[in-house]
């Protein structure tokens, strides 16, 4: 029997190894297309590649699960076979430069087959199973100092592995040098640049290409990102970023994933950690496109926090959600969302529709405004680590998917996201200047979302949040829809020009906000009526209207619809407009 189990285990391990190698080969093929898409300015193709790569892993795992079931037959639930399969898989995967990613793939297969609740270290790879760090070859190329910063940057740009011609490389090097020299002069130590160390592969995402690295000045390291754009007249250096905050936003949790050719993901994460020491490993892996391994790393970070601390899960700050029970650990900037069994009025959505919207966000361009949500199934946590009030809420409101027994809380399905400050609380608690900036960025967030065909549906401030960098993001997806699926209408009697007074809906609009004396379809949206839902009053209301009043007109939304339907892909940069070189130095 032992020999038979061993043979079955080796067969299962081989099937999973073959599945993983097929996945990695196809993933590498899709990722390698990013350079050609950028050089050809094929932005629609880049979007298709992004969706194809996002869908790839689940398809390969599903196929591999079928092959493993066929291989194991009646022994498919035999945990001794799976324990030995893990050992056999580890023996062949340990020497791989991407061993940690391979381990997460193995875990996905085992959890899909066995529906494990919690984590079973006998048949799953944990952080403790990772092989000892090897001496990886350098992930960067060093460019020693030149006579001038301009000459150094010109050499870097000429060496970039991009075949498309630059519009004006000398100009870009000169403008970037002005920015970089001014930054270095402003540092307390004023130590000159010794070298620039750039990651060997180019990081591609959307319409951008990024040279990512660091500036070495003696013992000091400063992050550096050179953001490239490809316009009608050629490639141009669009921005140079050299603060941890700016580079962190480029790698933010509201961005879509990079397409970057990597053989050694762990080594690249280690390199990026020198630029962004506050970024968790889970976020870096996710940003590099290894979202499933990033999800596994996040779970390990939560487990480590629970093991080392004594804080308890408590309800998250903010208004109580009608669709989700939301909770957090005070000492960890992560929130957890569990879908309620029933939704209180006026919510009319279903559990399946909510999950479909989260899936849509996962596959969509998040434009720096939609929080990346990691989806988990069959997790278990110690019941003693839940506050009594939260435990009671989970029992009574989420009982269909939550079971409390044996000292554990088993949760069938949840989402985990980075914790942010709800916008309604932020503007209430911040000083006036900071609140004004948040309201201005709230309008920018609505514009960015619209440009990527996203309409939040529910525009209450409580559904938006503010990151530690002060950026406004959207995190409540239960009413999210496509802009192109909406019918943006003007209120009857709004006046000439599609209600272009900017913010109709008052007495002059001919409608007092009660039951409308005209037909309203399920997809109809009246932008003139959105202002009361925003909950802005006084000076903050005035600030929003002055900067973003056109968002309250049907004309603006119909114009963006027309652009989207025509196939336009709008530029959205992971940096401020004033940071673009030609704006900083016209």
From Swiss-Prot:
It catalyses: L-seryl-[isocitrate dehydrogenase] + ATP = O-phospho-L-seryl-[isocitrate dehydrogenase] + ADP + H(+). It is found in: Cytoplasm. Pfam families: AceK_kinase, AceK_regulatory. GO terms for biological process: glucose metabolic process; glyoxylate cycle; tricarboxylic acid cycle. One of its GO terms (molecular function) is ATP binding. It comes from Anaeromyxobacter dehalogenans (strain 2CP-C). InterPro entries: AceK_kinase, AceK_regulatory, Isocitrate_DH_AceK. Keywords: ATP-binding, Cytoplasm, Glyoxylate bypass, Hydrolase, Kinase, Nucleotide-binding, Protein phosphatase, Serine/threonine-protein kinase, Transferase, Tricarboxylic acid cycle. The active site is at 372. Coiled coil: none annotated. GO terms for cellular component: cytoplasm. Its main location: cytoplasm. This is Isocitrate dehydrogenase kinase/phosphatase. The gene is aceK. Belongs to the AceK family. Bifunctional enzyme which can phosphorylate or dephosphorylate isocitrate dehydrogenase (IDH) on a specific serine residue. This is a regulatory mechanism which enables bacteria to bypass the Krebs cycle via the glyoxylate shunt in response to the source of carbon. When bacteria are grown on glucose, IDH is fully active and unphosphorylated, but when grown on acetate or ethanol, the activity of IDH declines drastically concomitant with its phosphorylation. Its EC number is 2.7.11.5, 3.1.3.-. The keyword Cytoplasm applies.
């Amino acid at each position: 029997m032992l020999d038979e189990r061993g043979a079955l285990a080796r067969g299962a391990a081989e099937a999973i190894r073959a599945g993983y190698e097929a996945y990695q080969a196809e993933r590498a093929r899709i990722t390698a297309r990013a350079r050609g898409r950028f050089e050809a300015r094929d932005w629609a193709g880049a979007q298709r590649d992004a969706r194809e790569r996002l869908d790839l892993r689940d398809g390969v795992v599903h196929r591999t699960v079928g092959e493993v079931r066929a291989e194991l037959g009646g022994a498919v639930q035999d945990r001794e076979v799976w324990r030995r399969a893990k050992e056999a898989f580890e023996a062949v995967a340990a020497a791989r430069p991407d061993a940690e990613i391979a381990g997460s793939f193995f875990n996905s297969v085992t959890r899909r087959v066995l529906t494990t609740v919690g984590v079973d270290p006998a048949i799953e790879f944990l952080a403790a199973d990772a092989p000892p760090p090897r001496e990886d070859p350098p992930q960067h190329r060093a460019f020693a100092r030149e006579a001038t910063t301009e000459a150094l940057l010109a050499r870097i740009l000429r060496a970039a592995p991009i075949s498309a011609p630059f519009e004006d490389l000398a100009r870009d090097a000169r403008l970037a040098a002005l920015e970089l020299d001014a930054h270095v002069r402003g540092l307390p130590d004023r130590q000159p640049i010794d070298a620039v160390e750039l990651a060997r592969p180019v990081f591609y995402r959307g319409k951008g290409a990024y040279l990512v690295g660091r500036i070495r000045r003696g013992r000091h390291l400063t992050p550096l990102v050179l953001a490239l754009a490809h316009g009608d007249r050629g490639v141009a250096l669009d921005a140079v970023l050299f603060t941890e905050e700016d580079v962190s936003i480029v790698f933010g949790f509201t961005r879509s994933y990079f397409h970057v050719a990597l053989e050694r993901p762990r080594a690249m994460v280690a390199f990026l950690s020198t630029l962004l020491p506050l970024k968790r490993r889970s976020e870096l892996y996710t940003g590099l496109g290894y979202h499933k391994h990033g999800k596994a790393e996040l779970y390990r970070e939560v487990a480590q926090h629970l093991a080392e601390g004594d804080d308890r899960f408590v309800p998250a700050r903010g208004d109580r959600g009608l669709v989700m029970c939301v909770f957090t650990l005070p000492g960890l900037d992560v929130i957890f969302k569990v879908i309620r069994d029933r939704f209180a009025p006026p919510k009319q959505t279903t559990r399946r529709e909510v999950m479909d919207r989260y899936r849509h966000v996962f596959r969509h361009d998040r434009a720096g405004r939609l929080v990346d949500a990691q989806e988990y199934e069959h997790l278990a946590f110690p019941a003693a680590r839940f506050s009594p009030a939260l435990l009671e809420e989970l029992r009574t409101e989420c009982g269909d998917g939550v079971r409390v027994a044996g000292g554990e809380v088993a949760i069938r399905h949840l989402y985990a996201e980075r914790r942010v400050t709800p916008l309604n609380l932020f503007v209430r608690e911040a000083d006036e200047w900071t609140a004004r900036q948040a309201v201005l960025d709230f309008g920018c967030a609505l514009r960015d979302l619209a440009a990527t065909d996203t309409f939040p549906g529910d525009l209450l401030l409580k559904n938006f949040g503010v990151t530690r960098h002060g950026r406004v993001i959207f995190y409540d997806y239960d009413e999210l829809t496509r802009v192109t699926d909406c019918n943006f209408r003007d209120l009857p009697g709004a006046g000439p020009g599609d209600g272009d007074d900017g913010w109709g809906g008052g007495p002059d609009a001919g409608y007092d906000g009660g039951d409308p004396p005209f037909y309203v379809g399920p997809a109809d949206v009246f932008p003139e009526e959105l202002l009361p839902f925003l909950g802005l009053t006084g000076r903050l209301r005035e600030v929003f209207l002055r900067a973003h009043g056109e968002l309250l007109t049907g004309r603006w939304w119909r114009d963006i619809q027309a652009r989207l339907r025509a196939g336009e892909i709008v530029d959205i940069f992971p940096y401020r407009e004033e940071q673009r070189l030609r704006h900083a130095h016209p």
